Amino acid sequence: MAKALQGVMAALLTPFDHQQQLDSESLRRLVRFNIGQGIDGLYVGGSTGEAFVQSLAEREQVLEIVAEEAKGKITLIAHVGTVSTAESQQLASAAKRYGFDAVSAVTPFYYPFSFEEHCDHYRAIIDSADGLPMVVYNIPALSGVKLTLDQINTLVTLPGVNALKQTSGDLFQMEQIRRAHPDLVLYNGYDEIFASGLLAGADGGIGSTYNIMGWRYQGIVQALREGDVAKAQRLQTECNKVIDLLIKTGVFRGLKTVLHYMDVVSVPLCRKPFAPVDEKYLPALKALAQQLMEEKA
């Protein structure tokens, strides 16, 4: 299973319609588009998927639709994390039922939980996942939970934990984790340092911009396998030029707008309170979509 979890995993966006409801047809197209890019898997229902502005029923529906489109074709990881252990367990059970390959959960947030409470939270989810491996999700910038290296080392050695999504930007810590846990599947979480993350010991990555240019990240992996660091650096620079623009537009809404221009997503809106893309960025996003479509062709 560890080998199946390695690679380039797109953190899947969740399309909505003009009424802010789940757009299941756009979601199906997006899953197929990602498969067509040659990515290794999908990370479903995470930060990029706007999970925390969805109901539990909606999150289950997303898991079901993605499984219908992609089960058996690529690796599927269900992010089931919520601030509630019981709700996370419910989503983990759904992931097992729909045939996902693994579950993942962000550290419980908002309340100042003790570290032992964090551990108990993960143990309960792992139990409900009924044999599916757990990917611990460390993203201190959004969760507000700043785990120490010792705490990370403890979490990744809990029975049932097979992987870590490390979205901290700390490459030294990435290398320390790899050194301490040579068999752990380790994902780089920040797209803009993907190549550096691989050099620091990551097995692959989980990222939002893979939705529109997954082949570039696969190219970075291949270049490093071949020892061509200069090529990997060039590809990372091209990815980062895109990320520069998306930071200005707002990453999720910018990605949806690009996918709208690619005829993948019908409505380029995130769920409120996220606002639409500022119209001044639309020409640049349309040009980017055209460039990427030509590059992919």
From Swiss-Prot:
Catalyzes the reversible aldol cleavage of N-acetylneuraminic acid (sialic acid; Neu5Ac) to form pyruvate and N-acetylmannosamine (ManNAc) via a Schiff base intermediate. It is found in: Cytoplasm. Keywords: Carbohydrate metabolism, Cytoplasm, Lyase, Schiff base. Pathway: Amino-sugar metabolism; N-acetylneuraminate degradation; D-fructose 6-phosphate from N-acetylneuraminate: step 1/5. Belongs to the DapA family. NanA subfamily. This is N-acetylneuraminate lyase. It is an enzyme of class 4 (lyase). It holds the Pfam family DHDPS. PANTHER family: N-ACETYLNEURAMINATE LYASE (PTHR42849:SF1). Its EC number is 4.1.3.3. The keyword Cytoplasm applies. GO terms for molecular function: N-acetylneuraminate lyase activity. It comes from the Bacteria. Signal peptide: none annotated. The gene is nanA.
